[in-house]
């Protein structure tokens, strides 16, 4: 399934503490992706705005959370919400013929949302792993899952992912 990638977004020390509730599932998704030879890609947010304190490059807050399994060196940084704003990431997807992306990480109401929208707009098949995402405001998760579906993304659980339901070929 070389045309598919698991994209892990913004699981960094400055992200919401709610990541602890999904980290086991995210790591299980990473294990499965490795076993099935999907690309595993990590996206990190860098906050370049003056006066902000979170996600500052070179700080502990900008580092990936220590519990996250890192199995590849396919790491890209972004300064805006959508992962596709990183031209190297977009080029990587193109160069490797990746057409299906499975998203995990945070924040469901910000960077995951923006990445989903922009990837769909760019013609990618986007699959959100519903039990591998979180948000600062967890009450927004049902609304975000409905939003993703309304934009043409499939919303699937980790179990459905592992069983191959909805996996891009």
Predicted regions and their residues:
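Short acidic, Gly/Ser-rich segments with clustered Asp/Glu that frequently serve as metal-coordination loops
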Residues: 12-18
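Short amphipathic alpha-helical segment that frequently serves as the phosphate-/nucleotide-binding helix
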Residues: 19-27
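Active-site-adjacent betaalpha module
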Residues: 1-5, 28-36, 53-169
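Glycine/Thr-rich phosphate-binding loops of Rossmann-like dinucleotide-binding domains
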Residues: 17, 50-51
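Catalytic metal-binding/acid-base residues of hydrolase active sites
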Residues: 12, 46-47, 107, 133
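Von Willebrand factor
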Residues: 33-49
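Short hydrophobic beta-strand that contains or immediately precedes a catalytic carboxylate
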Residues: 8-9
